[in-house]
């Protein structure tokens, strides 16, 4: 039996010119996740895989340091990267393709974060809908297939594998294991917290393909994050 612990990255720099950089809170979230995983896994042999984005690698570094495993080899797999949110939004609202235009639009809202989430939810629904696949640099079926390929490779790296990735790939994994439709998958996506851990189990005979022979052991674990310290974030 193979156990994959899918870790969503810590909080990135929402609203900044460079989103792909952990905030100070995101680093703290990575450390808390490391403390929790360290207590759970003890001295067990682990393999560690990460997407290639800075927020993935930096979350992995903070987590592994807190586990006392700072020297652990990190395998990088770009197939575990997130979809391009800027492209998804721009295809839905071409008038907001420029980052400055998007910031100006959100600045007029009473709650910019809530306004962005509403806009983003509409954009992702369009992206996943299958009616406009040719519009996107990476359409939903292509994204889903590359993520599933990356997860299948990760599952072949050992019996206990930590995977540092984003909400989109975790959504894909849960959808494949539970057989959710796209609307149900999006509900999972929006519930995922920064630093949340989702655990999948795969029989040794099923590791080469995500789906049959896989099961969901836990979803969006947030022990240590959901408390009075303000560590629980969604974006």
Kindly give the residue locations of the regions a language model identified.
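Active-site catalytic microenvironments for nucleophilic, acid-base chemistry
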Residues: 36, 40, 62-66, 153, ...
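Generic beta-sheet signal
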Residues: 4, 46, 159-165
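Active-site metal-binding loops of divalent metal-dependent hydrolases
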Residues: 10, 167-168, 220-221
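Extended, charge-rich helix/loop segments that form flexible
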Residues: 97-134
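A mid-sequence, solvent-exposed acidic-amphipathic segment
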Residues: 130-161
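Active-site-proximal alpha-helix that buttresses catalytic centers in soluble enzyme cores
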Residues: 2-77, 140-141
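Short beta-strand scaffold positions
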Residues: 50-51, 145, 164-165
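Acidic, low-complexity terminal tails and accessory targeting/binding regions
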Residues: 69, 82-111, 141, 157-160, ...
């Amino acid at each position: 039996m193979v156990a994959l612990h899918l870790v969503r990255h810590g909080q990135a720099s929402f609203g900044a010119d460079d989103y792909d950089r952990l905030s100070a809170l995101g680093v703290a979230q990575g450390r808390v996740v490391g403390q929790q995983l360290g207590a759970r896994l003890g001295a067990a042999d682990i393999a560690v895989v990460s997407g290639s984005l800075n927020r993935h690698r930096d979350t992995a570094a903070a987590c592994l340091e807190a586990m006392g495993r700072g020297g652990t080899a990190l395998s990088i797999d770009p197939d575990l990267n997130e979809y391009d949110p800027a492209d998804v939004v721009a295809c839905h609202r071409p008038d907001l393709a420029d980052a400055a235009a998007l910031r100006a639009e959100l600045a007029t809202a009473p709650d910019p974060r809530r306004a962005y989430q509403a806009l983003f939810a509409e954009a992702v629904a369009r992206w996943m809908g299958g009616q406009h696949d040719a519009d996107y640099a990476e359409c939903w079926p292509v994204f889903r297939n590359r993520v599933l390929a990356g997860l299948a490779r990760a599952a072949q790296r050992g019996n206990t594998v930590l995977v540092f990735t984003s909400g989109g790939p975790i959504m894909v994994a849960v959808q494949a294991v539970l057989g959710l439709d796209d609307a149900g998958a999006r509900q999972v996506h929006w519930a995922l917290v920064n630093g949340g851990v989702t655990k999948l189990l795969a029989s040794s005979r099923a590791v080469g393909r995500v789906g049959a022979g896989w099961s969901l052991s836990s979803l969006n674990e947030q022990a240590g994050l959901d408390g009075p310290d303000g560590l629980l974030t969604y974006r």
